[in-house]
Amino acid sequence: MKTTLLTIAATLALSGAALAEPVKVGIAAEPYPPFASPDAAGNWVGWEVDLIGAVCAAAEMECVVTPVAWDGIIPSLTSGQIDAIMASMSITDERMQTIDFSDKYYNTPTVIVGPKGVAMTPDAAGLAGKIIGVQVSTIHQDYAQTYFGDSAAEIKLYQTQDEANQDLVAGRIDATQADSIALDAFLATEAGAACCEVKGAVADDPAILGKGVGVGLRKGEDDLKAKFNAGIAKVIADGTYEKISAPYFASSIYGG
């Protein structure tokens, strides 16, 4: 895991109420384009990285982006190694038993992607006998195991979504399930465009898929939560959110 921290300078002068120490904002160390991934120089780039900078500036906080392995990101938060999570983490009842969340900052559908020309629907019947690849320790693992576990040949787990995508291209799995934006990015690549297509959105289950994506926070950190909520609200209200989103997405991903 990279130990180099990418510092996002919120150049506004900190007010007296601002936090004295930089806020360590955890992102997943595994690449998750277009939200966060390292460029050729090893710098973390992407929509979520840009949003962290904008939200922290709007809230007059100095923030440090800190890559953490996805499967250890909540323990890193609760143990104090990081102060917040902005890593496309869905707000679910299960997670809220352990941590708190800010207001949502995006909400997009969950979809199934499979090979072109293969009849497939995004439900248990359509995925019967199929090998479905999902990223481990995600809402997609929980959903696939709950809804497709009895009918699918296998729910195959991957450390990263990129690995699942590569196996789909190679024909080692029959389908993958993930956030629509992440899979749109895959389908925009040469390999993805050649092999695969969206088969449809899965039926929503907010208990598993959550109520949008928010900033993960330790319970009891009410002041920090208020700062993130204020920063999110400000970048949405002043148009910064849409300005940041425009290079990445054809339409708003804020959702309902």
Which functions belong to the PLM regions below?
Residues E21-M89, Q97, D238, P247, ...:
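Extracytoplasmic small-molecule ligand-binding "clamshell" domains
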Residues A54-A58, T66-P67, D71-D83, T98-D100, ...:
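Short helices/loops that flank or line small-molecule/ion binding pockets
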Residues A29-E30, N107-G114, A191-N229, F249-G256:
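Periplasmic-binding protein-like
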Residues V49-A59, V118, G126, K130-I131, ...:
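Extended ligand-binding regions for polar small-molecule ligands
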Residues G72-P75, M89-Q97, Y143-Y147, D174-L209:
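A ligand-binding cleft/hinge motif common to bilobed small-molecule-binding domains
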Residues M61, S90, F101-A152:
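A conserved helix-loop-strand patch within extracytoplasmic ligand-binding domains
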Residues F35-P38, I52-M61, H140-Y158, N165, ...:
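Ligand-binding cleft/hinge of the Venus flytrap
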Residues E62-V64, I139-I155, E197-V198, N229-G256:
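Ligand-binding clefts/hinges and TM-proximal coupling segments of bilobed small-molecule sensing domains
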